[in-house]
Amino acid sequence: MILEHVLVLSAYLFFIGLYGLITSRNMVRALMCLELILNAVNMNFVTFSDFFDNSQLKGDIFCIFVIAIAAAEAAIGLAIVSSIYRNRKSTRINQSTLLNK
């Protein structure tokens, strides 16, 4: 695959995730957009690793670490959202003032 096509696709994914993260009012949607941003970054790691240094797997291994950290982040984030929903009955970002009290 051509490098420019993959980079354009990754940039689209990154900016869709960034737009969703900025405009989202739901916590679950914000977590999904954050995961989309991390996947776009992972796509760049794998692409540059394959394009520039095909003999070593540095980008691929770094991508595996990022996926593991993103999975832990998603689990912790969903646990926090679940706890906030149990207490407040809402997952809207602008309605959660749990830390202010």
UniProtKB/Swiss-Prot annotation:
Enzyme Commission no: 7.1.1.-
Key word Flavoprotein present: no
Keyword hit for Signal: no
Keywords recorded for this protein, A-Z: Chloroplast, Membrane, NAD, NADP, Plastid, Plastoquinone, Quinone, Thylakoid, Translocase, Transmembrane, Transmembrane helix, Transport
Topology versus the membrane: Multi-pass membrane protein
Residues that span the membrane, as ranges: 2-22, 32-52, 61-81
Catalysed conversion reaction: a plastoquinone + NADH + (n+1) H(+)(in) = a plastoquinol + NAD(+) + n H(+)(out); a plastoquinone + NADPH + (n+1) H(+)(in) = a plastoquinol + NADP(+) + n H(+)(out)
Annotated GO MF terms: oxidoreductase activity, acting on NAD(P)H, quinone or similar compound as acceptor; quinone binding
Main localisation: plastid
InterPro entries xrefs: NADH_UbQ_OxRdtase_chain4L/K, NUOK/Mnh_C1-like
GO biological process, any: photosynthesis, light reaction
GO-annotated cellular components: chloroplast thylakoid membrane; NADH dehydrogenase complex
Enzyme class: translocase
Subcellular location: Plastid, Chloroplast thylakoid membrane
HAMAP family attached to this UniProt entry: NDH1_NuoK (MF_01456)
Similarity comment: family membership: Belongs to the complex I subunit 4L family.
Function: NDH shuttles electrons from NAD(P)H:plastoquinone, via FMN and iron-sulfur (Fe-S) centers, to quinones in the photosynthetic chain and possibly in a chloroplast respiratory chain. The immediate electron acceptor for the enzyme in this species is believed to be plastoquinone. Couples the redox reaction to proton translocation, and thus conserves the redox energy in a proton gradient.
Subunit structure: NDH is composed of at least 16 different subunits, 5 of which are encoded in the nucleus.
Protein name, entry field: NAD(P)H-quinone oxidoreductase subunit 4L, chloroplastic
Organism: Aethionema cordifolium
